[in-house]
């Protein structure tokens, strides 16, 4: 650590002990960036370009130190100088470049691409203010800007600029890079394009701003409010700015390597992460034709370069843009898209596979499927539903294009970084092979009946719960009991993820306690979720949870047995405290609606037991751990799809014929709730559950209550519960993103790893 010591002195003319935490952080930032630069970058003839609207990378300091192999040395140096690395981490702002599972997956994938020595890059946008910072005021979500870019940051200007044409004007870009460290390997770049005139001062009244002022607003926010025409067009401006820069950058890199553009597929493979980057297809064709390549050949070249990952079964999430919008924003792409559509209609005249439909809507996913060489789902069930239901018409045409790549998570962040005690204990039992070969965790199974090992796992969990308790007190002001069961649901707020189902369970327990039925073990229900600013019902669910939080906290008859806490501004940093502390992992989406999920994997890896439906990757978790080590409830995906096809689900029938369900649903608009909450929000949510309930909350309620009660009862047998924990940890190896990326490379990308 002599170099670090010298750097600190050179910067501040004092030793580390005399420095503030901010000074130490800035010195470590410079030191770590230098270390990454010296280690070098992955390169090769052919590269993967992973293009995504979001990268939820989290704080980078500790993760980079771990991947560089110097975390322990730095932590020891700081301790010698009276500093704690945890305090230094608190100084670092979390990059506001993502929101949910899509962005976190992209971040995990970059970590694995670098660790496996694959030549690759991530490409996205440099958002200044993120999605938004969530505040709770008057038991409602309030959105404010979430700035993160400081004078000293992980961003490095790359000295690269392109011109992006729009209708009536063009914009110059500037490229900034963030280094993504491979574990004991070289780094790769996350390339983030920005505009030079982004003006954060134009934001007012929360996150309101002039959506028409593209010169100054283009890279301010991730997913700007699209509830009006200007917001929807701004999203198109953003997406095209991202893909035009990406396309120009990719062609530049290939050309510098001596690529004849007819052979672009030998130099580049582009992974389109969801539909936001779909315009890369017509944009690449435009650029190739400008370079003298005939249209049909350009389309053929692009279709050998682009691969598409589908992340959703929700039809509304598959982007469809009105042609009028495209004419207003990127008119030069319209003739290309029309020509691509004509080529498809000449071969496949059926309406349901058209790129441009009869309403003049451009279907981005359809373009990706027709002009990409690979289409993958992200969990076995998800891919099966795509092939047999949602994208069946395309599967019938292109069966060879479809494949599954079950999602994964990087164990470097979600175990080694966020749970040092568990990592160290696993290493003491089975060595450190699991850090690069995650399936080696199965070696833990030989300890599943070892009482000393099981007791130690429980001890580590208790310590994690104490740390989490401190975090929750500082975040919410609510003091929770570390000896209670931690039942956690942390994910984007959406009706299909069914936070409202969990809330109804909490209401049922509240009513039981008020009726004199005391639980044998106290429970803490923990939520973390942001609702999209224009998603009214999702914000109503947050209001319900915050109202219940206060109702329970202030009731002396109930509070000793049960607490509900809603973490404010849930992000990666919060997740790193919550995953290690969890006992019961809530994965309760309506079967057939969650593509995969990755929170389920992070909980499992940290020794939580899943309570969930047979949806997404829960199916594969269930197969791996066996029925004794997971709690499964709810209607099957087949039955759910059948209900939608027949339109025969009626929540009102269930509500009117089930006394317990009616009592719980009606409690939402009871006198107690209305005295604390807002009548409009609570009545709207009540009406939604009774009259619509599109995601079949009431259908699964009774089974959910039964299985959740069973899980809470089983927790009392500590040895058996610890065995469930151990089996979950041991079987989590399949869900390493290293495995996922190896499969992408073997089946889709065909890159040569660096020696």
Labelled PLM ranges:
Residues 1-755:
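A conserved ligand/cofactor-binding region detector
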